[in-house]
Curated annotation (Swiss-Prot):
The lineage of its organism: Eukaryota, Discoba, Euglenozoa, Kinetoplastea, Metakinetoplastina. Ca(2+) 1 binds at residues 118, 123. Ca(2+) 2 binds at residues 148, 152, 154. Residues 1-35 are annotated as: Disordered. This is EF-hand protein 5 variant 2. It comes from Trypanosoma cruzi. It comes from the Eukaryota.
Amino acid sequence: MQARGTVKVQGDANVDGKMSTGQHPHHQHLNSTQANATTTALEYRAMNRPLYRGPISHNIISEMAEGFYVLSGGYKKLFIPSKDVYALMQNVGMHLTEEEFHDALRVIGQSEPQNADELSFSDFLLLMTREVDDTMADELRSAFFHYDKHKTGYVTRKQFTELFATLAERSTPEELEELLAVAEVDETDDKIDYNRFVNELTSRVNCM
């Protein structure tokens, strides 16, 4: 499983999802300026992420900054239309209804009607990485399917430990114990309800 699940939006593009590779002359300036402005928020989010994930990396910030630049029409704008962000999310596989999209805007603090039409880079970053968390949940659940051949909804403690020990970012023994605690498993349990585990992780992330 590729833990990041990030959406790469590169080069010249319109909002129909057709992207071409390439760098922009203002890209580097945009990255550094916006990254500095969101450092504190990112550090806070990193502390609250599930143990199998690392903090948001510079690469993720760079990719999101490039996407923001593309949606701004190639100009260094402070805000972009939220409707363009919604269209982009639809075209890169983040299938939300309009109601779900507006719910997500409320979660990131865009609850006021006068603010809902435009997003700053910080809002864009929070929104896109939040949706990545949902993609992560699907990827993690799919990883459990590898062990649950008969789709019972359960894996053994050994299989659970093996899964997290073989991920790209291997969990330490201490982290595995914490993950087992999230799964509400004690030493006498051998079966783990992985759907409940994934849902609990998702719930914790969404409460950030």
